Design a protein with these regions (language model features):
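N-terminal Sec-pathway targeting helices
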Residues: 1-14
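Conserved active-site-adjacent core of cysteine acyl-enzyme catalytic domains
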Residues: 28-31, 76-81, 86-89, 127-272
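Active-site nucleophile-adjacent alpha helix/oxyanion-hole segment immediately C-terminal to the catalytic cysteine
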Residues: 79-137
């Protein structure tokens, strides 16, 4: 029994010495190893975080094997802006401020007043109505509206061939030639800073509205994506029922729709 006790004591002493040596060795390990490990871990987290903000292009299998293909996939595609489903380009809008027509049959005086105001010429609707000969139950004939428009805009009622001034175009039919001419005149007037004068049937423009005859002020256009053609036409409507809480009387319509709405009224005209 004494021998066994001595053996147990020796083994215990040896175990204690081994544990002490192991503890001492761990305390003497270089701290730079720990620092390097921490630095490596931080760098990986930064890389991973940066990847979170990038679009995931790994759904394409070939992007993992071809660097050129990856760059092509990562390149953002230029998206064409659309308005009411129609691709558009630059907005070319004239500064035509909405006026509400002050009588039910004052759409022409209100339209002309807006057109004049856009050029810094202030003439009230009642003065214009009197000069135009606006009457009930019809309203204003376009020839008189444009005559008075020219008077206040340019100083004469009937411009000569070589003089600046508004001319009336009567829309008899719609075809590629008449549409192209209409669009070119819109572009030219807008570039020169002059609104246009449109007469149309609001029943063809506004859903649920009865057929009638109405005048509005053309206020420029929105170009096609290549900025070479007319995609949509701006106009400002003076009738109180056709006002938007945000945009007022400002509307857009395609040139084809606008011309189509002119056909069929008693005076299917626009002035440019």
């Amino acid at each position: 029994m004494a021998v066994q006790k001595k053996s147990i004591i020796v083994i215990a002493i040896i175990s204690t010495l081994a544990i002490s040596i192991a503890v001492l060795a761990s305390r003497m390990r270089p701290r730079s190893v720990t620092k390097d490990t921490q630095a490596s871990s931080a760098k990986s987290e930064i890389v991973n975080d940066s990847k979170k903000d990038q679009p995931d292009h790994n759904t394409r299998k070939d992007s993992q094997t071809n660097n050129n293909q990856v760059s092509q996939v990562n390149s953002p595609k230029e998206e064409v802006e659309k308005l009411y489903g129609i691709p558009i380009g630059k907005r070319n809008k004239l500064n035509v401020t909405t006026q509400i027509q002050q009588r039910w049959n004052f759409c022409a005086p209100a339209t002309v007043s807006m057109m004049l105001a856009s050029r810094g010429k202030i003439v009230d609707q009642f003065t214009l109505a009197r000069e135009m000969g606006t009457y009930e139950p019809f309203g204003t004939h376009n020839r008189d509206a444009i005559r008075i428009l020219n008077k206040h805009m340019f100083g004469y009622e009937f411009p000569q061939t070589n003089q600046a001034g508004y001319r009336i175009e009567t829309v008899r039919e719609i075809n590629s030639a008449s549409i192209e001419l209409f669009k070119q005149r819109i572009i030219k007037n807008t570039q020169d800073g002059y609104p246009m004068y449109y007469t149309f049937n609001p029943g063809k423009i506004y859903p649920g509205i009865a057929n009638a005859e109405h005048n509005v002020a053309g206020a420029g256009y929105i170009a096609t994506p290549d900025n070479k053609d007319v995609a949509l036409v701006y106009y400002v409507d003076p009738y109180y029922k056709f006002q938007d809480p945000i945009y007022g009387g400002l509307k857009v319509v395609t040139p084809e729709e606008l011309l189509n709405a002119m056909v069929g009224v008693s005076e299917p005209d626009y002035a440019w």
